[in-house]
Design a protein with these regions (language model features):
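H-loop/switch region of ABC-family ATPase nucleotide-binding domains
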Residues: 199-200
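ABC ATPase NBD coupling module
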Residues: 71-85
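Conserved ABC ATPase "signature" region
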Residues: 116-134
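Conserved ABC ATPase signature
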Residues: 138-142
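Catalytic Walker B motif of ABC-type/P-loop ATPase nucleotide-binding domains
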Residues: 163-166
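Conserved catalytic motifs of ABC-family nucleotide-binding domains
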Residues: 159
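Conserved ABC transporter NBD signature motif
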Residues: 60-71
Length: 211
């Protein structure tokens, strides 16, 4: 089943003449693992951001973006928040609270989930990611690798269908990068989550896929 489809998608930023994306047709099958590879400035991040309306950049867009056959603009923000997860390149970009436990709970709180359900989901995800030892720590004390794992866990606690990763290990050391990608592969294998990842280097892509 196609979870995401792009039909003749084009985009140019406001004030720019050149299109960053031009007539892109793409079908993403549910449960697949996809890598978008290209040089810096080739439009990888722009393309990923098109797949979640709250992250779409300002500019001129044409074509269609479908989520399970529905135009993305018609999909509620509640559904997009829960079912389309996004992890940014910079580990510090999306952390919004000062404690690890609260960061895990924040997304669920924002969609109005009852507190008892939040506690269960947060406990499950903390155990799955092995972050119990730093569960009560300040987010400011975490390493880059820990922050990026926390970002991933904070997305996964929402039980998303799609995981969008924008060069997620480019700012991590090799060991942290390997740990992060091993976790992504585990999530994909065990939960069947659809993964779409942007990377700039074919060599890096080969290493990441072989983790």
């Amino acid at each position: 089943m196609k979870i995401i489809e792009l039909k003749k998608l084009s985009f140019r930023y406001s004030g720019e003449d050149k299109e960053v994306l031009s007539d892109i047709d793409l079908a993403i099958e549910e449960g697949g693992f996809y890598v978008i590879c290209g040089a810096s400035g080739s439009g990888k991040s722009t393309l990923l951001r098109q797949l979640k309306t709250s992250l779409q950049p300002v500019g001129q867009r044409s074509g269609r973006i479908l989520y399970y056959g529905r135009d993305l603009e018609e999909v509620s923000q509640y559904t997009q928040s829960a079912k389309i997860g996004f992890v940014f390149q910079n580990p510090d970009t999306q952390i919004v609270t000062d404690r690890v436990w609260h960061e895990l709970a924040f997304g669920l709180e924002s969609i109005g989930m009852p507190q008892d359900m939040i506690r269960v989901r947060v406990a499950e995800m903390a155990s799955y990611f092995g972050i119990q030892n730093w569960f009560y720590q300040s987010t400011d004390t975490l390493s880059g690798g820990q922050k990026q794992l926390l970002n991933l866990a904070s997305v996964m606690v929402m039980h998303p269908k799609v995981l969008l990763l924008d060069e997620p290990v480019s700012q991590l050391d090799p060991i942290a990068a390997a740990d992060f990608m091993a976790t992504v592969h585990k999530l994909h294998a065990e939960f069947g989550i659809t993964v779409i990842m942007a990377e700039h280097s074919l060599e890096e892509v080969a290493l990441l896929i072989c983790v």
